[in-house]
Amino acid sequence: YISIIDVVLKLLIVYLLSLTSYDRLIFYAFLLLIVQVLIRITYGIYCKRHFIETAYRFVWDKMLFKEMANFATWQLFGNLAAVSYTQGVNILLNMFFGPAVNAARAIAVQVQSAIQQFTANFQQALNPQITKNYAINDLKRMHTLIFASARYSFFLLFFLSLPVLLETEIILSLWLKEVPEHTVNFIRIILVISMIDVMSNPLITAAGATGRIKVYQITVGGVLLLILPFSYGMLKMGGIPEFVFLVHLFFVCVAQVVRLGLIRSMISLSLRKFFKEVVVRAFMVTCLSSIIPLLSFLLLEQTLSTFFLICVLSVLSVSITVFFVGLLPNERQLVLLKINQWIKLKKS
C-alpha cells in the first residue's frame, strides 16, 4: 500500500506542475522531497506499530559508532563512484555531441529503469535472507541464495528485455513522435549491461553483510571509475557515441570478475559453482531462447502484428528454456508440484 501511495503522490506532483506558474524544476524538486519525507515517516510509523524490536532510545557506544562510520564512509565512496561515472558519461556526451545525444541516453536509461524495477523488487525479498544467513554463519545456505538470486534475476530481466532488444525501433515509434538518433543502439547496449550487472546485486549484498567493504569498494569503485577516462579517450580519437556504452559494458564485465574474486575470499564462495550454476545456465538460456524470436525478427516484415507475434514467441521461448535449461532439477520438481497443486485447487 505504501508503494501505491508513493506512485499516487508522484502522479499528483505531475498534475500540480501543470497548474503552477513558479519555476517548474524547483517546484518539482521541492514536491519530490516532501513525498520522500512523507514515505520515510510512513515506513517508520508502520515499523514501530508492527515490529516490537523497532524502538528509539539514546545510547553511547563508541565502538559501534566507529564501525558504523567506517562502513558508511566506504559505502559512500562506492556510491560516489557510481554517481561519478554515470554523470560523467552525461557530461562527456554533451561535450562531444550536444544535448540531442544526451536526450537519447536519457530515453535509454528510462527504459532500463522501468525493466530493472521488476528484478529490484524480486531481489529485495532475498537480500535480507542473504544477510541473515551470514549473521548466523550458515554460509552454505547463503551461497545457495546468492546463486538463486543471481540466476532468477537474470532470467526475469532477460524475459522482459528480449522483446525490447528485438523490437526496439517499433516500441520507440509507438512511444515517441520523434526518436533521437542513436537511441535504438543505446537501449540495446544498456540492456545488455543491465543483464550482466543484475547478477552482481546479490554479491554486493553479500559484501555488505560482512561489513568489511573497504577493499571491496576501493577496488570495484576504482574499476568502474575507469569508464570515464577510457570513454574520453575513445571520443577524443573520433569515436561514435556508442563507444561510451561499449566501454561501460567492458568495465562492467571486468568489475564482475574482480567482484567475484573479492567475494570469494570474504565468504568462501565457490567460483566454479557460481560459473556452473549461474553464468553457464544464463548463457545457455540466452542462446537457446533467442533462436526462434530472432529468426522471426529477421525473416518477417516489421509490422505491428509481427511485433505482437515476436513478443509472444519471446515469452514462450524464454519460459520453456528457463524451465528445462535454467532451473536446477529440484527447482523444476518444485515448479511442477506448484502447478499440480494449482490444477487440483481449480478442479475442486
What are these model-derived regions, one by one?
Residues 1-2, 26, 47, 191-223, ...:
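Membrane-interface junctions at transmembrane-helix termini in multi-pass inner-membrane proteins
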Residues 2-49, 71, 221-226, 240-262, ...:
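Hydrophobic alpha-helical transmembrane segments
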Residues 15-16, 41-42, 143-198, 225-236, ...:
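Alpha-helical transmembrane segments of multi-pass membrane transport and lipid-handling proteins
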Residues 25-30, 63-72, 91-113, 141-144, ...:
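Interfacial/gating helices of multi-pass transporter permease domains
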Residues 25-32, 43-86, 125, 129, ...:
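Interhelical loop/hinge segments that connect adjacent transmembrane helices in multipass membrane
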Residues 31, 38, 73-74, 89-91, ...:
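Alpha-helical transmembrane segments of polytopic membrane transporters and translocases
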Residues 51-53, 108, 112-150, 157, ...:
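Helix-loop junctions and terminal segments of transmembrane helices
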Residues 264-275, 293-348:
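Membrane-proximal transmembrane or re-entrant/amphipathic helices at the cytosolic face
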